């Protein structure tokens, strides 16, 4: 259901889908609402807006709403699953496969808690305005030909008053109860994913415990601010002998408090760098290590243009380098 929402959000963001666009409910989608699964309770032939279907998926956990979205976007659930898998590949979800839009039991539906965390992070980061839906505690569906139905959000941690604002519950016969949850305290956000809980109560209790443990035991450190000078690299035969470089994104790292002393940042580049240099050129990389294990790599980008020296200055510079080894 998280991935189904992501596909819809991506299309809305690109302008290829509108919230007020309506999809006609098929008999196949309606039958899901009568089969005992969590549902939005759509009716055959109903014309339902994308906005309401998304609320039905996110808040009411409607499997029928998932299928309606899938058919409306891709023509069939099979086609939609292909789109889901393409997105999973794009996100680096290497141990995931989607066979349908809802997560209903199918041997070809599988994932890992890590992949689900990556997917959740993508949704939160890239669609913050729509992520707001995940903290809504109820949804009223004024359905055609029937009384309005109000359903509560199935995420139990939304009601625990600890700051959780999403994201999604799950259930499979094989893995029982699962939950992807997220909490924000100040500028820190943590995502926790758990699976294999035997009861709803243990899912809620253990997921809450995991989030609180994360808040208590981990610290988020800012490595670099987007487009702000990070360091200088040596330049060869340039009008300046140093070039400012930056990282083109904000870089934060959450680490266990006891590992802070093991955090190392190493700069890699083949230098001195030959001028001319253009602003935006990738000149090297920054590697982040914890306990000598590389955990992240980021490009070092030139913050400025460096012109090449004239011929006389280059000759003198070469002589100076041969004598003193200094650029």
Model-derived regions: residue spans:
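Domain-terminus/edge residues, biased toward the C-terminal soluble/receptor-binding domains
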Residues: 93-94, 107-110, 114-327
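Active-site-adjacent loops and short helices of periplasmic peptidoglycan-processing enzymes
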Residues: 2-117, 121-125
């Amino acid at each position: 259901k998280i991935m189904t929402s992501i596909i819809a959000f991506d299309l809305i963001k690109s302008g290829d889908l509108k919230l007020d666009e309506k999809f006609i409910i098929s008999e196949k989608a309606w039958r899901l609402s009568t089969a005992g699964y969590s549902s939005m309770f759509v009716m055959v032939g109903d014309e339902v807006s994308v906005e309401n279907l998304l609320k039905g998926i996110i808040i009411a956990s409607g499997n029928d709403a998932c299928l309606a979205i899938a058919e409306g976007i891709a023509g069939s659930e099979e086609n939609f699953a292909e789109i889901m898998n393409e997105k999973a590949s794009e996100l680096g979800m290497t141990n995931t496969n989607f066979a349908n839009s809802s997560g209903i039991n199918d041997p070809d539906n599988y994932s890992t808690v890590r992949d689900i965390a990556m997917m959740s992070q993508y949704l939160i980061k890239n669609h913050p305005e729509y992520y707001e839906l995940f903290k809504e505690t109820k949804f009223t569906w004024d359905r055609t030909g029937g009384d309005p139905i109000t359903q509560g959000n199935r995420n139990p941690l939304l009601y625990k008053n600890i700051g959780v604002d999403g994201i999604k519950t799950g259930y499979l016969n094989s893995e029982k109860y699962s939950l992807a949850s997220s909490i924000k305290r100040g500028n820190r956000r943590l995502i926790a994913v758990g699976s294999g809980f035997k009861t709803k109560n243990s899912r809620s209790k253990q997921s809450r415990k995991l989030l609180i443990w994360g808040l208590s035991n981990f610290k988020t450190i800012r490595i670099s601010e987007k487009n702000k000078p990070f360091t200088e690299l040596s330049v060869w035969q340039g009008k300046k002998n140093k070039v400012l470089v930056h990282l083109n994104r904000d870089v934060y790292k959450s680490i266990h408090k006891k590992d802070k002393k093991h955090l190392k940042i190493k700069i890699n580049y083949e230098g001195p760098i030959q001028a001319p240099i253009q602003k935006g050129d990738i000149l090297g990389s920054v590697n982040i290590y914890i306990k000598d294990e590389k955990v992240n790599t980021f490009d070092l980008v030139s913050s400025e243009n460096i012109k090449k020296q004239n011929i006389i200055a280059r000759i003198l510079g070469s002589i100076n380098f041969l004598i003193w080894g200094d650029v």
